[in-house]
């Protein structure tokens, strides 16, 4: 970084230190946004693949009831 960034009193051809720090901040921000979008996309594809797999599998078990109806009185009995 010292080859590219110099202080304001340096010779011409180098970038000012404040500009260099700003560019590093912008590069880190862009890299972070890229990582965020990339991870979100991978997670979306993984969830979609997992959902299709779960919907595509046939269950041999007949007792796959998730919700079971109950009488209204049973909820209030203690």
From Swiss-Prot:
This is Protein UL41A. Glycans are attached at residue 9. Keywords: Glycoprotein, Membrane, Transmembrane, Transmembrane helix, Virion. It is a single-pass membrane protein. It is found in: Virion membrane. GO terms for cellular component: membrane; virion membrane. It comes from Human cytomegalovirus (strain Merlin). Belongs to the HHV-5 UL41A protein family. Pfam families: UL41A (PF17591). The chain crosses the membrane at residues 19-39. Disulfide bonds: none annotated.
């Amino acid at each position: 970084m010292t080859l590219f960034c110099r202080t304001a009193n340096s010779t011409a051809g180098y970038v000012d230190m404040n500009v260099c720090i700003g560019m590093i901040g912008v590069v880190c921000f862009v890299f972070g946004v890229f990582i965020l979008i990339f991870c979100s996309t991978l997670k979306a594809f993984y969830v979609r693949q997992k959902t299709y797999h779960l919907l595509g599998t046939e269950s041999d078990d007949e007792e796959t009831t998730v919700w079971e109806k109950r009488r209204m009185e049973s909820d209030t009995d203690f």
